[in-house]
């Protein structure tokens, strides 16, 4: 599986990448603090899921909407989860602190054809 992690919080990027590698050994992870770099990656390579945080989310979703990207986006949320109508294309909200169980639960919503590749 290929994931993209987008966050202005470098420490959070590292923690999330370590957890994803634990849940999906051998997965490929692209980390970035810049939504534009992530969009460039999405346009050249299929990414199974994007993880982002509330600080980066508005910019990322604006870019995704502009590119009509269908990639699943998971919002990492420090506070109360926003209502569904505010999360747009977000598949799931993962509340802090992020744990392996929360990632596994969120990724169960990934389409079956992707899960079969794992």
Protein language model features and the residues they cover:
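Short amphipathic alpha-helix used as the core "switch/output" element in two-component signaling
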Residues: 40, 56-70
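The C-terminal output helix
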Residues: 108-118
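C-terminal output helix
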Residues: 98-107
């Amino acid at each position: 599986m290929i994931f993209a992690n987008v966050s202005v919080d470098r420490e959070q990027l590292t923690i999330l990448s370590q957890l994803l590698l634990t849940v999906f050994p051998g997965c490929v992870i692209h980390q970035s603090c810049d939504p534009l770099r992530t969009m460039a990656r999405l346009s050249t390579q299929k990414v199974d899921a994007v993880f982002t945080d509330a600080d980066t989310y508005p910019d990322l979703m604006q870019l995704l909407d502009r590119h009509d990207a269908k990639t699943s986006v998971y919002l990492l949320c420090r506070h109360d989860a926003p209502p569904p109508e505010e999360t747009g294309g977000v598949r799931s909200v993962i509340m802090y602190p992020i744990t392996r169980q929360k990632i596994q639960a969120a990724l169960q919503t990934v389409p079956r054809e992707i899960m079969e590749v794992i």
